[in-house]
Amino acid sequence: MMAKNKMKPKKALAKRIKISSTGKVKFGHAFRSHLAQNKSTKQKRQSKHGTFMHPTDYKRLKDLM
Protein backbone atom coordinates (compact mmCIF):
# COMPACT_ATOMS: atom_id res chain seq x y z
CA MET A 1 0.00 0.00 0.00
CA MET A 2 1.33 3.44 -0.91
CA ALA A 3 1.77 6.20 1.63
CA LYS A 4 -0.05 9.49 1.22
CA ASN A 5 1.89 12.30 -0.39
CA LYS A 6 2.72 15.22 1.83
CA MET A 7 1.51 18.64 0.77
CA LYS A 8 4.44 20.95 0.07
CA PRO A 9 4.26 24.66 0.87
CA LYS A 10 4.38 27.17 -1.95
CA LYS A 11 7.92 28.52 -1.72
CA ALA A 12 6.96 31.86 -3.29
CA LEU A 13 4.55 32.51 -0.43
CA ALA A 14 6.83 31.07 2.25
CA LYS A 15 9.56 33.56 1.33
CA ARG A 16 7.21 36.54 1.61
CA ILE A 17 5.45 35.96 4.93
CA LYS A 18 6.40 35.27 8.53
CA ILE A 19 4.19 33.59 11.11
CA SER A 20 4.37 35.22 14.55
CA SER A 21 4.39 33.27 17.80
CA THR A 22 0.72 34.14 18.32
CA GLY A 23 -0.16 32.80 14.86
CA LYS A 24 -0.57 36.11 13.04
CA VAL A 25 0.74 36.41 9.48
CA LYS A 26 3.11 39.31 8.80
CA PHE A 27 4.03 40.53 5.32
CA GLY A 28 5.76 43.47 3.70
CA HIS A 29 4.15 46.14 1.55
CA ALA A 30 4.49 46.28 -2.22
CA PHE A 31 5.45 49.24 -4.46
CA ARG A 32 8.75 50.08 -2.74
CA SER A 33 11.39 48.97 -5.21
CA HIS A 34 11.61 51.89 -7.66
CA LEU A 35 9.81 54.96 -9.09
CA ALA A 36 9.55 56.37 -5.58
CA GLN A 37 9.47 60.00 -6.72
CA ASN A 38 5.93 59.45 -8.04
CA LYS A 39 4.64 58.25 -4.68
CA SER A 40 3.56 60.45 -1.80
CA THR A 41 5.69 60.77 1.32
CA LYS A 42 2.89 59.23 3.34
CA GLN A 43 2.70 56.19 1.06
CA LYS A 44 6.47 55.63 1.23
CA ARG A 45 6.57 56.08 5.00
CA GLN A 46 3.67 53.74 5.72
CA SER A 47 5.00 51.02 3.44
CA LYS A 48 8.38 50.90 5.25
CA HIS A 49 7.07 48.60 7.94
CA GLY A 50 5.42 45.23 7.60
CA THR A 51 1.81 44.71 8.54
CA PHE A 52 -0.34 41.83 9.72
CA MET A 53 -2.76 40.10 7.42
CA HIS A 54 -6.45 40.24 8.27
CA PRO A 55 -7.73 36.96 9.78
CA THR A 56 -10.37 36.58 7.06
CA ASP A 57 -7.55 35.99 4.55
CA TYR A 58 -6.08 33.06 6.53
CA LYS A 59 -8.39 30.61 4.77
CA ARG A 60 -6.74 31.38 1.40
CA LEU A 61 -3.27 30.89 2.88
CA LYS A 62 -4.03 27.55 4.46
CA ASP A 63 -4.13 25.77 1.09
CA LEU A 64 -0.85 27.34 -0.01
CA MET A 65 1.15 26.60 3.13
UniProtKB/Swiss-Prot annotation:
Any one Pfam family match given in the protein's UniProt record, by short name: Ribosomal_L35p
Annotated Basic and acidic residues bias: 56-65
Entry superkingdom: Bacteria
Alphabetized GO MF terms: structural constituent of ribosome
GO annotations of cellular component type: ribonucleoprotein complex; ribosome
Gene Ontology biological process terms from the UniProt entry: translation
Keyword Transferase part of the UniProt annotation: no
Region (Disordered): 30-65
Keywords recorded for this protein, A-Z: Ribonucleoprotein, Ribosomal protein
Protein family (similarity comment): Belongs to the bacterial ribosomal protein bL35 family.
Matching NCBIfam families: rpmI_bact
HAMAP family: Ribosomal_bL35 (MF_00514)
Name listed for the protein in its UniProt record: Large ribosomal subunit protein bL35
Organism, as annotated: Mycoplasma mobile (strain ATCC 43663 / 163K / NCTC 11711)
Gene name linked to the record: rpmI
